[in-house]
Amino acid sequence: MSSTKTPISLTIKLNQFTDKPTGLDINPYHNSPIMWRNIIKQLSSRTPQKLLFSSKNRTYSFLGFGQDSIFKDNTKFRSLIPISCSNIVMGFQNLGEYLPGDEFLSRPLIKNQVNNNFCCRKSYASVAEAVAVSSTDAEEDVSVVDEVHELLTELKKEEKKQFAFRRRKQRMLTSGMGHRKYQTLKRRQVKVETEAWEQAAKEYKELLFDMCEQKLAPNLPYVKSLFLGWFEPLRDKIAEEQELCSQGKSKAAYAKYFYQLPADMMAVITMHKLMGLLMTGGDHGTARVVQAALVIGDAIEQEVRIHNFLEKTKKQKAEKDKQKEDGEHVTQEQEKLRKKVTNLMKKQKLRAVGQIVRRQDDSKPWGQDARAKVGSRLIDLLLQTAYIQPPANQLAVDPPDIRPAFVHSVRTVAKETKSASRRYGIIQCDELVFKGLERTARHMVIPYMPMLVPPVKWTGYDKGGHLYLPSYVMRTHGARQQREAVKRASRNQLQPVFEALDTLGNTKWRINKRVLSVVDRIWAGGGRLADLVDRDDAPLPEEPDTEDEALRTKWRWKVKSVKKENRERHSQRCDIELKLAVARKMKDEESFFYPHNVDFRGRAYPMHPHLNHLGSDICRGVLEFAEGRPLGESGLRWLKIHLANLFAGGVEKLSLEGRIGFTENHMDDIFDSSDKPLEGRRWWLNAEDPFQCLAVCINLSEAVRSSSPETSVSHIPVHQDGSCNGLQHYAALGRDKLGAAAVNLVAGEKPADVYSGIAARVLDIMKRDAQRDPAEFPDAVRARVLVNQVDRKLVKQTVMTSVYGVTYIGARDQIKRRLKERGAIADDSELFGAACYAAKVTLTALGEMFEAARSIMTWLGECAKIIASENEPVRWTTPLGLPVVQPYRKIGRHLIKTSLQILTLQRETEKVMVKRQRTAFPPNFIHSLDGSHMMMTAVACRRAGLNFAGVHDSYWTHACDVDKLNRILREKFVELYEAPILEKLLESFQTSYPTLLFPPLPERGDFDMRDVLESPYFFN
């Protein structure tokens, strides 16, 4: 064997569909692979091998060639993947990818100026070179077996990188956008995520300049002028405080955190975050100090991290020439890293910036105390500098009425069960600011907007979602054990969950402009239509001109009631403004995306909080799929069914053919609604979901009026909803025939209505009780009163919440509210007694119809009680591998002193809440199962080429694909419950707590799960 040790790089061609490499290409110009077994042969052989290079027959070692190489001097060896496949560097990710650990900093690139390929010098740039380092001569005392293992290991690494690369490229292709368009949108997305606060601060500074130069302030919207008036004095106060802190003159505990961000950005964040809390809080323009301080402090810390990183690398660049010789390498690598981040908004290397910054930033998280102190100080400074002046409507000689915009006060709330009271600090805005809050949304910085490009694929607890904004795969709400459980889980274990979230996040949406224009017209006209709140407050009743205390007491109660209603209206108006602000901002985008994450039970949610498909009718009405698909004959049928479902009012309980008939009988109304939504007969306003109904009216009208309705394109998401889905899961767990029939797990001519079924049972029991002697059975009188009040509406809420473990007291209060609404029983004591009796009968009827569900619910609760009694939280793993830890622990209190007040921070203790662990486990376990079913369906739909969106127990796709969706969701439900779910749960409990004794599994019925496949109304 030749002793020449000049290494060559071998191009490894990987097959994305197999686990084995297809061959090794050592020809720099052609793909003429040597089969894998031949390479192994060469490795295993101790004799020289002859390899053929471009028809030249020479003798080479496996990893070298003679000094008279056949390759030209200027030859640069090829990268791992051919040029046509968007090369990645040997051992490197493609542009925009992230290399873990020190690998990121350790590989300088050499670029071939001819073919734009890259190779790595002084690193294991290829499998061949990696093996070459360990053995290039048959005489060395290294095992050939070790060489083979090393080769296999390196191949596996490269294959994983290539597979990830191909998946990402495929995602880009399936997103329906070319490379150039994708990069343009990506740059915009990064600006949205990284420059929002900076741009807001810049805008205020420019407005201040314009105001001074051109007197433009009077032309600003009222709320914008308020923000502008507060910005400069707040910024200056912050700057003064920062100077004291940076010079060491401030002894405050927050001092070392306070000067890490420019004063203008801190001012903007403080104003916007506080106003956001005042808008979204439901308490009449107030926010709790502790909540506001933590929210503001957290936002400041997030901005500080990236700011510190960029500033640190700037300084390192400036000091490069002063570095000692042994530190030059570090400086060079830091400079390379800085360039990667600073080019973030211009180039492709965006995906990993969050991880880069976190890895390079060696500063520890601030902690809750520091965030609270920084936030409190900023609120304190805003209180000192923010003033408001009513519009000028007084004589010039009068002094201006200038008053603080915000007031800090303490609120005392009496506890229900104790004589003691609870006190907490609040920030309350002036009435003028309060009235302006509803118009503030369009001027607010709204983080976590829908994305312009597909979200980053999830690969870990904090790796995925947004390109740059902090994103976490689970909403743990500070539950440490839950967070640690997810972090400990392997990527392989969580891959099914990651894949499902990626599927949901890759669904493309757009704004339905026609529906949005109707919403805007109604809102501009004062609301009051289509369930939109009245934009005006209800007038307060006039004070009676009398000394009669009874009349005055009645008046005071009316005033209190009207004020409560006005507070609710205000909250709803703010909510609508936020939704419309997002819709208006996104209406001209061709498409956008919602990154998703899960709650601790495994239910998926969009990360954007305001305008999303989990929201109200107005959200769902203005959102539609960005991709349109021809209806086809099946799609036209399902669009008609969908319209009937949205109209509701009992229509949704008809058979599918009955619903189609309803729609066809109202085609004139549908045309009128589409053509003249506000000027015509307004039939669509009678629907239970009016804006969604209007959207379907428009689409259906276009299709029916076209020359070929089947080829008409539809963007409408058509829903398939479960029938009391929680009870469906219980019936499947218990193989309960009676329960399965009640919730449509078996086929029927029309959908079974579980609420009507329970109401019928309740009525039978009450009729029987009404015949009894009141002297022996006191409830007989109540039964006689209630017989005429029993219907599905009376029992619906109790049946719905039964899956959540509703208690007798909860059921009593629910039924009492329904009876009070009807005014059937005037006397309060009689009303209470009737509600008690009705609740008892309703729960009895539920137990009879869903006996298996009750027994499973009881078993789950008993297991949870046994575990929690050992001071352990209940843990389980969902069918998709997500670890769940119930977060219910007793809360401890921690006092910290801030510049504003003493704050009480809540912290988890080590003591679990036994009762809460027990009562919450059954519904949480069922939610983890419905989340698993939705995720399984989502992934299967993607693989079948369907667009999919999900809202827990409501699955959406294009009208033309509903039949495919129905088949898939039924198959996945059967697949889910063919697994021994309860057996595995019990086994996991026994393994985790071997010293505890758990009750045996409840008996189950003989319902055949495969009957679900033939049930048309299981989801419909």
Curated annotation (Swiss-Prot):
It catalyses: RNA(n) + a ribonucleoside 5'-triphosphate = RNA(n+1) + diphosphate. SMART domains: RPOL_N (SM01311). Keywords: Chloroplast, DNA-directed RNA polymerase, Mitochondrion, Nucleotidyltransferase, Plastid, Transcription, Transferase, Transit peptide. It holds the Pfam family RNA_pol. GO terms for biological process: mitochondrial transcription. GO terms for molecular function: DNA binding; DNA-directed RNA polymerase activity. Its main location: plastid. The active site is at 721, 796, 953. Its EC number is 2.7.7.6. InterPro entries: DNA-dir_RNA_pol_helix_hairp_sf, DNA-dir_Rpol_C_phage-type, DNA-dir_Rpol_phage-type, DNA/RNA_pol_sf, RNA_POL_N_sf, RPOL_N. Residues 314-336 are annotated as: Disordered. The keyword Disulfide bond does not apply. Belongs to the phage and mitochondrial RNA polymerase family. DNA-dependent RNA polymerase catalyzes the transcription of DNA into RNA using the four ribonucleoside triphosphates as substrates. PANTHER family: DNA-DIRECTED RNA POLYMERASE, MITOCHONDRIAL. This is DNA-directed RNA polymerase 2, chloroplastic/mitochondrial. It comes from Nicotiana sylvestris (Wood tobacco).
